[in-house]
Amino acid sequence: MSSGKKPVKVKTPAGKEAELVPEKVWALAPKGRKGVKIGLFKDPETGKYFRHKLPDDYPI
């Protein structure tokens, strides 16, 4: 895990709230528009990967 990223409070696919650090972060935006930031997280219990929206002020 990269140490430069801060943990985000997300809801895992299992339905639990967890503070996780995204493994990958990218912006999802149509051309010329603001868009949203998406993070790739790994569920600590099941080991499955899932995506979740990040706050707008999150560094990429």
From Swiss-Prot:
Keyword DNA-binding included in the entry's annotation: yes
Post-translational modification N6-methyllysine, affected residues: K16
Keywords associated with the record: Chromosome, Cytoplasm, DNA-binding, Methylation
Consequence recorded when altering F41A: Results in a significant protein misfolding, reduced thermostability, reduced ability to mediate DNA compaction and bridging. No effect on DNA binding and constraining DNA into negative supercoils
InterPro entries noted in UniProt: Cren7_sf (IPR038647), dsDNA-bd_Cren7 (IPR020906)
An example Gene Ontology CC term for this record: chromosome
A Pfam match: Cren7
Record PTM text: Methylated at multiple sites, to varying extents.
Taxonomic superkingdom: Archaea
Documented effect of changing K42E: Slightly reduces the melting temperature of the protein. Slightly reduces affinity for calf thymus DNA and poly(dA-dT) oligonucleotides. No significant effect on affinity for poly(dG-dC) oligonucleotide
Keyword Cytoplasm: yes
GO molecular function list: double-stranded DNA binding
Subcellular location: Chromosome; Cytoplasm
Subunit description: Monomer.
Protein's job: A highly abundant chromatin protein, it binds double-stranded DNA without sequence specificity; there is approximately 1 Cren7 molecule for 10-12 bp of DNA. Constrains negative DNA supercoils. Induces DNA compaction and mediates intermolecular DNA bridging. Binding does not require protein methylation. Binds single-stranded DNA weakly. Increases DNA stability against thermal denaturation. Promotes formation of loose nucleoprotein structures with long DNA in the presence of albA proteins.
Family listed: Belongs to the Cren7 family.
Protein name: Chromatin protein Cren7
Source species taxonomy: Archaea, Thermoproteota, Thermoprotei, Sulfolobales, Sulfolobaceae
